[in-house]
C-alpha cells in the first residue's frame, strides 16, 4: 500500500529495480537527474533468479525493458521477486503454446506513453503484476495510461495484485496464497485469454 500512499504525494517518483545493475542506475538517476523526491523500493531477500536486462538497456524515466519477447499477451512486472514469477508464468505458458511478452517496468507511478504505445503495439491482452494492493499500483497506472490514449484504449487490461490483507509465510507460500506465483499466474492468464 506504500505505492498508492507515496504515489499520492506531489513530486514523488517511486522505483523498484529488478536487479543490482538497475538498482545502481536507479540510485544514480535519483541523485544526479531527478528534479523530484524519489523512493526506491528494494526486495528484502535474495533474488530467486538473475534477471538479465538487455545489453543496450538505459534507465530512462517512465520506461522499462522487454525481458522475454512474446506476441500473444503482455505481462508488466517489477522487482526481482515479481519478475521471477512473471518469467515462470511465461515458461509455463510457452508449454501451452502461448507466447507471453514480459516487461520490466521499474517506474511504479510514472510511465512514458510513447514507450508504452510501442511496447503494446502488437497485443490486445495486457496483464499487470503488483506485489501491492490492486489499488494505486502499476495496474492502475497502466489502466489510466491506456484509457488516456486513443490508440491503446481498446486494449484489455487485467490486474494481478494482493487483493486482501497480505498473507504471512515464506515468500513462496504468500505468493501462492494470493495466486501470484508463476504457475498460478500462467493459469489465470490462460483462463483470462480463453
Question: Where are the model-predicted features located?
Answer:
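Short, surface-exposed loop/strand segments
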Residues: 37
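Midchain, well-structured core segments that form catalytic/ion-binding scaffolds
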Residues: 20, 40, 45
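Thiamine diphosphate
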Residues: 43-194
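Conserved thiamine diphosphate
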Residues: 1-33
Amino acid at each position: 500500500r506504500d505505492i498508492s500512499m507515496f504515489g499520492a504525494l506531489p513530486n514523488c517518483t517511486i522505483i523498484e529495480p529488478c536487479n543490482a545493475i538497475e538498482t545502481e542506475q536507479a540510485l544514480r538517476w535519483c541523485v544526479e537527474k531527478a528534479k523530484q523526491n524519489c523512493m526506491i523500493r528494494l526486495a528484502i531477500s535474495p533474488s530467486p533468479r538473475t534477471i538479465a536486462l538487455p545489453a543496450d538497456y538505459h534507465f530512462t524515466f517512465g520506461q522499462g525493458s522487454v525481458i522475454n519477447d512474446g506476441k500473444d499477451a503482455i505481462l508488466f512486472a517489477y522487482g526481482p521477486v515479481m519478475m521471477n514469477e512473471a518469467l515462470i508464468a511465461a515458461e509455463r505458458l510457452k508449454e501451452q503454446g502461448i507466447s507471453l511478452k514480459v516487461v520490466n517496468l521499474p517506474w511504479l507511478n510514472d510511465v512514458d506513453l510513447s514507450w508504452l504505445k510501442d511496447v503494446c503495439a502488437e497485443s490486445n491482452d495486457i496483464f499487470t503484476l503488483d506485489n501491492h494492493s490492486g489499488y494505486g499500483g502499476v495496474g492502475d497506472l497502466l489502466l489510466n495510461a491506456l484509457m488516456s490514449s486513443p490508440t491503446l484504449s481498446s486494449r484489455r487490461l487485467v490486474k494481478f495484485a494482493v487483493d486482501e490483507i497480505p498473507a504471512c509465510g515464506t515468500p513462496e507460500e504468500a505468493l501462492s496464497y494470493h495466486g501470484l506465483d508463476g504457475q498460478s499466474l500462467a493459469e489465470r492468464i490462460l483462463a483470462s485469454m480463453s
